[in-house]
């Protein structure tokens, strides 16, 4: 979607510009509650980007390098809820917290594994609706590698009836079931020390996210699918020794993870107007 635009990324052009629109957490509060970005908003955003860049180019990612962003990202969320959501804090910030507070004994790997598993679970749950077959229909129709003769089968009766066909519905259900199966397979492999099952789970999420990525879906972050593959192989493929039960060594971290990954999304599914699914 972005090649027609130069540069092909533009978040900073909004968040680093005074006067642009924002959604403060405490509307009307002095200094932080305005509906347009001021120099405090810009300064904290730019500072966070520079701290992240320092961590990216550093020889080693340490808690000391991550700690400024550990503090700044929630602060930026208070200043602008939109910024907190577009930062994908429900995923990236949760893992950053694990890397900041649990790096000493590598418990952050177990925390990241828990995050990945819940992300797969809730992503699969979000597909259990009546409109997802239509999503599949358009995504596959736009995909450059999907056979042309199958593209027409995605529609009920092309070109007269452009609703999702049974074929598209079947693909949608298969996709949701595949995504839900990923954490089940990986956790079962960890519980049974089954290396073949672990590799099968890794191949499953590679195929799942890779399939989405190569179809160039509109309106969704392709880089997230790449990260799920890369992170999944690192966490589950190369670190089978890190178990979720290890998190009991840090009960406060475990409680915070369960609150963020289980409780908040559950509330959001029942009260979507109150709690964003991106939390």
Outline where the language-model segments fall.
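Alpha-helical membrane-anchoring segments
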Residues: 1-279
